[in-house]
Amino acid sequence: IPDLASSRSTLPVLTKGPTGLLGPRGPYGPLQRFNIELSARGPAAVVGVLGKSFDSWLTKLGLPGPQGRPGPPGPGCRFALSNQCIKLAVEFAGQSKFSSFLANEGKKEGPEGEEGPRTEFDGAYFAGGKFPVVGKPFPQLKVFHAEPPFPTSRSTYGPSGSQPGKKGVVTPFKGNQPLKFNDFLVESDSRCPPDDSSFERSPAVSGHSSPATLNSRMKPAGFPGKGNGAPLKNGIASDPLENLKNRLGSCFPDVLDEPPTSPFFTGPSGYTSDGLNKTPTVSKTLTAAGDPGPGAGKVLESSKTDLVALQGEFQR
């Protein structure tokens, strides 16, 4: 199993999606005329609407064509596993249930600290070349000898920011509780649609948890480090999705900028609601719509024709 932590990559798995959904209804068929004898009732009103005489007062209005051909197979979706869980995913192929055997350690180093607060100092220099700092002096401000003319305006400077973060707390994963495979699986959503922007989402399948429950069985990783600057969002992000990205670090892809809106496993060959009873084929029914079908008209029966509606059709 490759170690993906250093390469900051994810485990790409491409699976062929199911057959696409049927396309939308076809357009209306062409207008056709019939040679029908004018009756003594009704046609005069139609003639008055059109402003001219004609030999057929019944027009074949094209009805919607048949549904389009099925779309192409879906492209499948890439999903990502944290690299500590790759072995778990491989071992799962031959097991239906298992107990946790993988220690998921927290991140050992926090991210870089943010830039520290800026502090104002007076630009008037002492004769010795040093300048007084209003407030607490910072060691990053170097003492230097100024050349005349000495500035007298007040300027705002801050210490050098982006200090390295401190090491986070390592929180090992407790390995004595049963897990489900989808506790470690997060399916990307925003990068999976096909090139054609018109695609259909599969209906939601009950029984699947949302990506925010990824941490339901995982102990949190080390909190982000605090640099010499301001702390990062009180040490941990408040947004659940951002929280996961901070915890998993390099093992979490950037594809989850938008939370997925569909369940983890969809399609006829995917997992059932308990995530344990079928072969691990993960796919997502994202397919392009089919081509519109050709129009096919249908003769309207004259005895059932509503002249008022027919006039509206002619006006349209």
Swiss-Prot record:
Keywords: Chitin-binding, Glycoprotein, Secreted. Glycosylated; contains mainly glucose, galactose, galactosamine, glucosamine and glucuronic acid. The keyword Secreted applies. GO terms for molecular function: chitin binding. Residues 152-163, 207-216, 269-278 have a biased composition (Polar residues). Residues 1-26, 149-173, 189-238, 259-278 are annotated as: Disordered. One of its GO terms (cellular component) is extracellular region. It comes from the Eukaryota. GO terms for biological process: shell calcification. Involved in nacre formation. Affects morphology of calcite crystals in vitro but does not inhibit their formation. Binds chitin. This is Nautilin-63. The lineage of its organism: Eukaryota, Metazoa, Spiralia, Lophotrochozoa, Mollusca.
